[in-house]
Amino acid sequence: TGPNVVNPVAQLETMHSRAPEMRFFSTTSFEVKPVRGLTLKSDFTADLDVLETDAFQPVIDVPGGSTTTLREQEHTRTFHYLWETTATYAEVFGKHHISAMAGFTTDYKKLRLYDFRTQNYPSDTWDKYQNLWQNGSWYRDPTENYYEYAMVSFLARLGYSFDDRYFLTASIRRD
């Protein structure tokens, strides 16, 4: 009968896969100078990403082709935001320059992913509405991953210079 050689063209032509993705990304900034030397600034960035994958591989009736149907569905949802707010004061007195900054940052991210894989569907045709559980034997157990991360940081910086020749800076950050 000869060697079992895979036909990659047949595999590509019979595989059905869709992966629509929706993504929203936005950055908003606000800055105000209420009095001379003082600047208040806030930046907010949000990122939302939703990806849904649906793939189906039918039986491929060629040498080396797939002998069973395979279906995979995956859903991933990610939400991330970063918020930074600072107050900065700077003033010059003759040859003396002073500056001070204080603020906080908030960083948050949440991800949820789940997927299902089955094989041995009764039909060789792909139907996106076909029940993933219908008459298929489990290829592997469904999986779910959940990740959540949050961090708040407080920060401050003091600066001094004399005659633009001598500089002193101190900073601190607490997460």
Describe these PLM feature segments:
Residues 108:
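N-terminal active-site segment of His-dependent metallophosphoesterases
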Residues 99-105:
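Extended hydrophobic secondary-structure segments that form protein cores and membrane-embedded regions
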Residues 45-47, 59, 104, 119, ...:
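Flexible domain-boundary/linker segments
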Residues 1-10, 54-70, 112-142:
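Surface-exposed loop/turn segments flanking beta-strands in extracellular/periplasmic regions
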Residues 8-47, 51-55, 72-92, 99, ...:
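Outer-membrane beta-barrel transmembrane strands
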